[in-house]
């Protein structure tokens, strides 16, 4: 068996076309979604990622802006800029690029975003809504993972799903989304014992810990679906996933590559959530 390759680039391209159609329909009603991104400092990776988000938003017809503050910006300065965007009626969605400089509290900033404009889905109110199954902004990487599974026509009901990693950004929210699809979910983490026994029984494995080569062929059940969220640069700058891709693809039923798997869907879901934010505040059904 050779796994079906779950091409995130193509899935994202198809999904963005649907978003573009919805943006055009909104414009005909007189509304244009706008994404505002706050970037603090000059970290090269953050700058590149923010530019990618801006370009992607503009490509589907949205307005996008980057609010760039100096590395030395105080927490108060960041909060003031955030408050301005919260109160700007032209802004549909706001995200703050992390990591932030040490003098700025990431949690304090994330909690200051208007929950109705929180397109990253990290505000405590939106996290709470996710866990009581209310409509909300879902963190973008988990949302992208679910779109990949949907696109691949993976039936999750009754399946054993193992999530490696318990972060609030990926591990915990994707576990909740899998539960919503009636999968039986196990979360593994750095303190888990005998991880192999859980993995060998998994129909779906989502790995999101940033440890290259963690998931090997000998712990994967034949036909399992493998979602690799790992994104770690090696000594040559080449991105590596958590999964031993070349070996595991020989036994898995389906697998995401790194790069080109989950990554393209993460930015796509930022756009999805920005569109949702605009629709919700205008009283337009999704």
From Swiss-Prot:
Sites where the protein binds NADP(+): 165-167, 190
Gene3D superfamilies attached to this UniProt entry: Leucine Dehydrogenase, chain A, domain 1 (3.40.50.10860), NAD(P)-binding Rossmann-like Domain (3.40.50.720)
Pathway, per record: One-carbon metabolism; tetrahydrofolate interconversion
Keyword annotations: Amino-acid biosynthesis, Histidine biosynthesis, Hydrolase, Methionine biosynthesis, Multifunctional enzyme, NADP, One-carbon metabolism, Oxidoreductase, Purine biosynthesis
EC number: 1.5.1.5, 3.5.4.9
GO CC term, one of those recorded: cytosol
Reactions the enzyme catalyzes: (6R)-5,10-methylene-5,6,7,8-tetrahydrofolate + NADP(+) = (6R)-5,10-methenyltetrahydrofolate + NADPH; (6R)-5,10-methenyltetrahydrofolate + H2O = (6R)-10-formyltetrahydrofolate + H(+)
Keyword Ribosomal protein: no
Gene Ontology biological process: L-histidine biosynthetic process; methionine biosynthetic process; purine nucleotide biosynthetic process; tetrahydrofolate interconversion
A GO molecular-function descriptor: methylenetetrahydrofolate dehydrogenase (NADP+) activity
Keyword Transferase: no
Domain of life from the UniProt record: Bacteria
UniProt record similarity statement: Belongs to the tetrahydrofolate dehydrogenase/cyclohydrolase family.
Primary role: Catalyzes the oxidation of 5,10-methylenetetrahydrofolate to 5,10-methenyltetrahydrofolate and then the hydrolysis of 5,10-methenyltetrahydrofolate to 10-formyltetrahydrofolate.
Subunit note: Homodimer.
Protein name per Swiss-Prot or TrEMBL: Bifunctional protein FolD
Organism: Staphylococcus aureus (strain NCTC 8325 / PS 47)
